Regions:
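Short active-site loop/helix that positions an aromatic residue
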Residues: 190-202
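Active-site and NAD+-binding cores of ADP-ribose-processing enzymes
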Residues: 9-136, 144-149, 155-167, 173-176, ...
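A short, exposed loop/beta-hairpin motif centered on an aromatic-Gly-Thr core
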Residues: 181-186
Length: 328
């Protein structure tokens, strides 16, 4: 009896998840759909652990979100305009709660993706306040890179910002960009930018510009999708926040894939693009922070973080007004 009691106590303390390694690289759209569903099923199965099952409504909510996202994947595979509307409606139902959480949406300068736990005093480890203070006060820089074609040089600002509006046909090849709105993509290091560009250092040149958020730029409202298995497990003592992370993690799973082929149909971007449509149409959120899908694992944080910001104005000065930019 005592042995069974000890086992039960251990089970009740086991509010950790395992077996979810992100990002994921696959070879085809079909493999993306299949692998995503497998990972969602694996994640949902872990909600049957006693520690999670005893939390009122948590397991049911997470399993429902996983089921909705599996349906969204089927709709993405169909790919018609009617499916896009359905995807947006279903996805919105899974994410709307996260929009109203300070950890989920915050100013750029207070976002976990860029400042870690430093802005969240209630999550601090005792005795490390000096470290958190330095993290909060450190100016951070963002970067953008481009690979030139043979004989091409980049020396002007407009050559280093978002894709021009006359390149709308290419927007489907960008993770968060939509037909109507391009996105400005930035990274926390020049290294992650080079990975995103698929830069071959032996054969190609690389131009990099630094984008330093100014006072207004630091106030941009950012959706944080930098949510990892390690972070969730590290929040085991913070039940409410861990519950929110568990509910958003299925979305992080299905948006953390990279398909290694040249197909124009990029199904792994479908849900990311839907999320950006929701943000643009229904919220005052101004960008999305996420881990690069070109990295090897979640240990790339914080050096492998990307930021996607939708561009609403064709005017170059307005679209870059939130940054002090160092030319390439």
């Amino acid at each position: 009896s005592r042995g069974l009691g000890d086992v039960y106590k251990r089970q009740m303390k086991d509010n950790y998840i395992n077996g979810i390694k992100l990002p994921v690289k696959v070879e085809s759209n079909e493999e993306y759909i299949s692998k995503s569903k497998q990972m969602l099923d694996h994640f949902a199965y872990q909600m049957d652990k006693p520690a999670f099952a005893m939390r009122k409504g948590l397991a049911e909510s997470v399993k429902s979100i996983c089921a909705i996202l599996k349906n969204v994947l089927d709709l993405a595979e169909k790919g018609d305009d009617d499916s896009l509307d359905k995807i947006d409606k279903k996805l919105k139902s899974t994410i709307k709660e996260y929009f109203y959480d300070d950890f989920g949406v915050s100013e750029l300068d207070k976002c976990y993706a860029f400042r870690g736990l430093a802005p969240f005093a209630e999550l601090h480890t005792p005795g490390k306040e000096d470290i958190y203070k330095k993290m909060n006060n450190r100016d951070f820089e963002l970067f953008r890179a481009r690979i030139p074609q043979k004989g091409e040089t980049f020396t002007m600002l407009h050559e280093m910002v978002h894709r021009p509006y006359n390149s709308q046909s290419d927007y489907g090849n960008c993770r968060f960009s939509n037909r109507k709105y391009p996105c400005l993509y930035l990274g926390t290091t020049s290294y992650v930018c080079s990975r995103e560009c698929r830069w071959d250092e032996e054969k190609q040149g690389l131009y990099v510009s630094c984008f330093k958020p100014n006072k207004e730029g630091k106030k941009l409202k950012i959706l944080n999708l930098v949510c990892t298995q390690g972070l969730i497990n590290g929040l085991a003592s913070y039940r409410d926040l861990q519950d929110k992370m568990l509910k958003v993690f299925p979305l992080v799973i299905v948006t953390s894939f990279s398909i290694n082929n040249s197909s124009k149909k990029k199904l792994e971007y479908s849900i990311s693009q839907s999320l950006m449509r929701i943000i643009i149409n229904d919220t005052d959120i101004q960008g999305v922070a996420y881990l690069s899908c070109q990295g090897d694992d979640e240990l790339q944080y914080p050096h492998g973080v990307n930021l996607a910001i939708p561009v609403y104005d064709i005017c170059e000065k307005k679209s870059t007004a939130n940054y002090v930019i160092i030319l390439p």
